[in-house]
């Protein structure tokens, strides 16, 4: 999710907390929390106002650094740990972490899930592994406590479930080896039950196989590429640090009489492949009230789509988009900051592309320069921890599937990293 849309979603979550309604699709016209001011913390990545994305961009930076063999600086890890509330949740950003969280503190499910993934990736080589372990457990416990009856999560605690938030939580479960099917709501619903409710059938004329962000007020689903990229990864049981699955298999869309999360994920990959086939990039519509009404390239979600396609065994379909990003994303990444560099690094990793030679940009160098200098790669450990995040529950997931229509068990097993 791009920072501007995180800002809008955070604002809408604030509205929900105040009791004025449930969180819906992001809108820049919504009221927003007061942006932070003053000097930024020394341990934080990026130089822009972190009100809406401080924890998110820090977490993505950690994931990308571990994926390239670097261990984030202890100062940076300590900053992220300090953002956690006593109940285990993470807000989007706390300007003064010495003040305890209260009822007015905006707890952010996306930030919490991203932080859980990040801390799980760095904990073994951090200065305080036990502290990081405790933070991961507390974050996971909080996410369980705010799970909606339908099995999913909204952006803010208590908000209506959406595909993106539910997917990033599934990624956190993947990173910590927790089975999503064991993460059930009071009604006995799993995160996959929630995701399937957002999946469009292959017969849908506008978005066959896609996922919606949320149903509209009338309950109708509309294809959303951002949600589809996120839900495709989640349906495959993957975290944000996913890798290329092999052998290659062109994604197709198939409706089952009894839908499954993995089939829905492959249908999502089919939608992404078709959407990227012509321009090789996704687009974002103008935000409400914008003077420029033309669609613009969506660099961040294009990178996410590349990861999702590669994880689904469709790296051939992902490569044109990856090459488009190599040629066109430099200015966007420079303007957007560390989270953008991290997204591009994860896309490069998923397609086995060198992130140090990404077009004319060394993505690793640019990311590392955006915050405290990380520890140099340890060749004995390399990115082992990051690798483990990607395969947290692949084996039990495959065994639990039994039979998957259209996908051989050998194909699924070959997607494992170990």
List PLM regions with ranges.
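Preference for long, amphipathic alpha-helical scaffolds in soluble/luminal domains
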Residues: 2-418
């Amino acid at each position: 999710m791009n920072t501007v849309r995180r800002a809008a979603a955070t604002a809408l979550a604030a509205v929900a907390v105040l009791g004025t309604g449930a969180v819906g699709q992001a809108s820049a016209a919504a009221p927003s929390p007061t942006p932070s001011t003053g000097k930024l913390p020394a341990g934080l990545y990026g130089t822009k106002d972190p009100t809406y994305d401080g924890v998110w961009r820090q977490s993505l930076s950690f994931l990308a650094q571990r994926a390239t063999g670097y261990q984030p600086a202890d100062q940076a890890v300590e900053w992220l740990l300090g953002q956690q509330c006593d109940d285990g949740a993470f807000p989007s950003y706390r300007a003064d972490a010495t003040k305890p969280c209260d009822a007015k503190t905006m707890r952010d499910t996306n930030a919490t899930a991203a932080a859980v993934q990040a801390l799980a990736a760095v904990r073994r080589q951090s200065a305080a592994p036990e502290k990081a372990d405790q933070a991961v457990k507390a974050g996971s416990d909080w996410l369980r406590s705010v799970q909606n009856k339908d099995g999913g999560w909204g952006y803010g605690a208590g908000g209506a479930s959406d595909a993106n938030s539910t997917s990033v939580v599934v990624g956190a479960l993947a990173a910590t080896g927790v089975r999503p099917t064991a993460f059930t709501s009071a009604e006995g619903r799993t995160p996959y039950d929630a995701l399937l409710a957002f999946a469009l059938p292959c017969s849908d004329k506008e978005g066959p196989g896609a996922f919606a962000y949320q149903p509209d007020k009338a309950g109708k689903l509309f294809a959303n590429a951002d949600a589809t990229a996120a839900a495709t990864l989640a349906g495959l049981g993957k975290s944000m640090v996913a890798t290329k699955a092999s052998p290659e298999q062109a994604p197709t869309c198939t409706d089952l009489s009894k839908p499954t999360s993995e089939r829905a994920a492959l249908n999502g990959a089919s939608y992404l492949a078709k959407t990227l086939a012509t321009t090789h990039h996704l687009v974002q519509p103008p935000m409400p009230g914008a003077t420029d009404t033309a669609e613009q390239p969506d660099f961040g979600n294009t990178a996410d789509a590349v990861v999702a396609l590669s994880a689904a065994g469709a790296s051939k379909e992902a490569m044109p988009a990856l090459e488009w990003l190599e040629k066109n994303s430099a200015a966007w990444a420079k303007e957007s900051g560390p989270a953008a560099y991290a997204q591009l690094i994860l896309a490069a990793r998923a397609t086995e592309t060198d992130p140090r030679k990404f077009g004319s940009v060394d993505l690793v160098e640019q990311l590392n320069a955006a915050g405290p200098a990380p520890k140099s790669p340890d060749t004995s450990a390399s990115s082992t921890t990051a690798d483990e995040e990607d395969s947290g529950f692949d084996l039990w997931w495959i065994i639990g599937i039994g039979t998957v229509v259209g996908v051989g068990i050998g194909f699924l097993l070959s997607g494992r990293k170990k």
